[in-house]
Amino acid sequence: MYKRQGFGAAWAAWVVDLQVEPASGRIRVNRIVVAQDTGMMVNPDGVRHQIHGNVIQSLSRALLERVDFNAQGVASREWGAYPIIGFADLPEIDVLLMDRQDEPPMGAGESASVPGAAAIANALFDATGCRFREPPFTPQRIRQALAWRGVHTVDDTEIQIS
């Protein structure tokens, strides 16, 4: 197996276009663009589909998913109530693949998910002026950060994205 020194997997970069409703803390992700360098691609459509899946899963993790704990351990034990993103909340996803057939294949795998949370956090900073360093970036956390900055928010306990 060929492996270049210092390069163990494919490279990916995200650009996120989102809006934040300051009063509610609600986030609407409009578009995500992902560029990926996987080296030689045997099946470019398969790589594109893999990246779409990575984006959807990463978006759900960054905005909604969490495991709650109490003194006894894990408190989130009911899968039916576990928050995940729905199809209606998915943004437009554009995938840009680098055509580098002269390079060895580096795989697609989960590499497109690596920059996801950071890209979303940076888009939130651009939209709100507040830094968010701990996902999930829930409406409650958005409202708390905005209130700390003196922005008027409503006090809802939970607001769904979209």
Where are the language model's segments positioned?
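C-terminal catalytic domains of large/alpha subunits in multi-subunit enzymes
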Residues: K3-S162
